[in-house]
Regions:
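Aromatic-rich transmembrane-lumenal/periplasmic boundary elements in polytopic membrane proteins
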Residues: 1, 153-196
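Short hydrophobic/aromatic helix or loop-helix immediately within or flanking a transmembrane segment
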Residues: 1-26
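Loop-to-helix entry region of an early transmembrane alpha helix in multi-pass inner-membrane enzymes
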Residues: 19-42
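Aromatic- and kink-enriched transmembrane "portal" helix at the membrane-lumen/periplasm boundary
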Residues: 25, 29, 33, 65-90
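Transmembrane-helix signature of polytopic, membrane-embedded enzymes
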Residues: 47-71
């Protein structure tokens, strides 16, 4: 479900290990807080710019609506809890802003732009990729359904990320799941032996 997320946070894990070796303290809360603060701040900035530059409402109204978005408990929690929701929110709001600018200027999302947005957002959570395709559909209109665009911007990236996600699951996740399952069976068998 999160094909590139572990690779995106891997440098933060290395930094935490390095700082732990140097200081003897686990500083993961502070290390994770920095990107979360960045993503939350720029989510606010881009949602404000969507209201202001694309929807063209007044500055005060844009500020109130942006603040209202961040007053919702789900958004507040996403901004402080170390999970992928704040990252997804930033990426989707950023992609929505880009799509809005393209629609406003009468231009289309090119194949490479769609693929780049798809890989970055779907790499965090696969369902985000579908949202990028919806953005591209509204931005490009009927041209979204051109064979070249469908093949190179939709089907090929979807197949590539699916193959990568399956490889990642079989390589990193499945062996750990099997080991946990075997350990559970072994412990269950030992418990049964003790009872009899």
């Amino acid at each position: 479900r999160h094909p590139f997320l572990s690779f995106m946070v891997w440098p933060l894990s290395l930094l935490d290990g390095w700082l732990m070796d140097m200081t003897g303290l686990n500083l993961v809360q502070f290390i994770v807080a920095v990107p979360l603060l960045f993503f939350a701040f720029y989510s606010f900035i881009f949602i404000f710019r969507i209201f202001r530059d694309i929807i063209k409402i007044r500055r005060f109204e844009a500020m109130v609506l942006s603040a209202m978005l961040f007053s919702f408990a789900y958004v507040m929690i996403a901004a402080v809890v170390p999970d992928h929701f704040c990252v997804s929110m930033f990426l989707l709001v950023f992609a929505l802003y880009i799509s809005g600018l393209k629609m406003q200027n009468g231009t289309r999302l090119s194949i490479w732009q769609t693929v780049l947005l798809f890989f970055v957002t779907a790499g965090v959570t696969l369902s985000n990729g579908v949202k990028i395709f919806i953005y591209a559909l509204f931005t490009n209109g009927k041209k979204f359904f051109r064979i070249k665009y469908l093949l190179l911007a939709v089907l090929l990236p979807s197949a590539l990320i699916w193959v990568f996600a399956r490889w990642e699951y079989r390589t990193f996740v499945l062996p750990k799941e099997k080991a946990r399952h075997e350990a559970r069976l072994k412990k269950s068998a030992e418990t049964r032996q003790k009872l009899f």
